[in-house]
Amino acid sequence: MLQGKTIIVTGAASGIGAATAALVSSHGAEVISVDINIPRTPVGRFLQVDLADRSSIDRLVAALPSGAHGLANIAGLPPTRPAEAVLKVNLVGLKYLTTQLVPKLSDGASIVNLASLAGLGWAESKDAVLASADLDFNEVSAFCVQHGIAGGRSYFFSKEALIVWTMQNRWTWRSRGIRMNAVSPGPVDTPILKDFIATLGARAEEDMKTMDRPGKPSDIAPVVAFLLSDSSAWIRGTNVPVDGGMYSNVLCGIHGL
């Protein structure tokens, strides 16, 4: 379903990004792996980038070929990192890379953003999310102070804003057939799972008890691959939960179902 396509995967050095790069490659795609860290066994061509740095992103965009058929925005920082860094990488840098790269993408390309179950409460943060629409790298520190975004809250906010941005761009590039969707994993057994447990404490332990098991990167990658493929051409601006039923569990609790 991806035979002959060129797919750019950020965060390809580990976890869900590495699993996605390997999977789409196995389906015949030419992969360009992107990360700040050098993968032990890179899939396809590797390019290094710091998504917290505008100039680094500019260099990446210049180095990437024209005509790519897909962009999987999977790179991200966990909630234990400084709030400013989390927002720069998970939101501002991701958005900047995407908008700069769109002119070089092939018509009919697919963009898939890795959001999170942590972004479920975006509606309660709507004012701050809307205020972040044009947030630039040099404005992140002041924005965090103004909106009280500190500690682990930065991760939740970055994913809330990413889900909203995905929905807002449901038709932005429709004239070229370029679509955008998001995937929201629940807890996944990756190198940063311990960071979530450290941040959420008892809440994380309770979620683990509710779930039969944490997810695996191999649970998430096939959904990303599907959204990158032509089989998902009629899916636009959608956030797909891949969380073992946790999203439905939360909704049932909220609505007494």
Regions found by a protein language model. Name each.
Residues R236-L257:
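Short C-terminal tail/terminal secondary-structure segment
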Residues L120, S184-D195, S248:
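Short, flexible catalytic-loop segment of classical short-chain dehydrogenase/reductase
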Residues T6, A13-S14:
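Conserved glycine-rich cofactor-binding loop
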Residues R174, R179, I235-G237:
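Short, small/polar-rich loop/turn modules that mediate ligand/substrate recognition or access, typified
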Residues Y96, S154-Y155, E160-I163, A182, ...:
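C-terminal helical subdomain
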Residues T41-S55:
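Rossmann-fold cofactor-recognition segment
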Residues P78-P79, E84, D107-S175, P187-V188:
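Catalytic loop of short-chain dehydrogenase/reductase
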